Structures are given as structure tokens and as C-alpha cells.
Curated annotation (Swiss-Prot):
This protein binds to 23S rRNA in the presence of protein L20. It comes from the Bacteria. One of its GO terms (molecular function) is structural constituent of ribosome. Belongs to the bacterial ribosomal protein bL21 family. Keywords: Ribonucleoprotein, Ribosomal protein, RNA-binding, rRNA-binding. This is Large ribosomal subunit protein bL21. GO terms for biological process: translation. The keyword Ribonucleoprotein applies. GO terms for cellular component: cytoplasm; ribonucleoprotein complex; ribosome. NCBIfam families: L21.
Length: 100
């Protein structure tokens, strides 16, 4: 069974037991979160679209890899280099359930 969930403006394909990195969620480590924005859920070829929830455990709150932003104007000696690290949450999918 797998599901497509939406969180942080992005969509993720998840299965039970899978580990994903999502945009920062306001939850403590080792706590369980419930994601209600399930776009579709599929079980052995049968697909459903609503009344589903995904329960996940927060494994870690951390920061992602550094993104380098480099700006330059040729022949003008103009160079700017900055970096950015986004806050992310690491989740383990525990349960995909379909409510009836």
C-alpha cells in the first residue's frame, strides 16, 4: 500500500516504514504527527482519493544541505556569494489508514 501526501507545498510518495525529509513541521522529536492532506492512496491496484490519514513519527529536526547563491556581473568586479540551509524534518511513516 502506498499514498501520495502533500506537506510544505510538495508531494511525496510514501509507503509504510519509509523515511522521508519534509519541510519543517512544528513537532518535537519522537512524537507522532498525523498528515490529513492525502492526495491518493492505492492498495493492490485499487485507488482511493479521500478520507485517508497518514501517521508518522518525527525522527529528527535538522537542517538540510547548504545551497550556494552566487551573483556576478561581468567586467564590473561585482560578485556576491551567500549560502542558505533550510530547516527540515525527518519522518518515518508508521501507518496509512483509510477511514470509512
Amino acid at each position: 500500500m502506498f499514498a501520495v501526501i502533500e506537506t510544505g507545498g510538495k508531494q511525496y510518495l510514501v509507503k509504510e516504514g519509509s523515511i522521508i525529509k519534509v519541510e519543517k513541521l512544528e513537532a518535537e522529536e519522537k512524537k507522532e504527527v498525523e498528515i490529513n492532506k492525502v492526495i491518493c492512496i492505492s492498495n493492490n491496484g485499487l485507488s482511493y482519493s479521500s478520507n485517508a490519514t497518514v501517521k508518522a513519527e518525527v525522527l529528527e529536526q535538522c537542517r538540510g544541505e547548504k545551497i550556494i547563491i552566487f551573483k556576478k556581473k561581468r567586467r564590473k568586479n561585482y560578485r556576491r556569494k551567500t549560502g542558505h540551509r533550510q530547516y527540515i524534518t525527518v519522518l518515518r511513516i508508521n501507518e496509512i489508514s483509510l477511514q470509512k
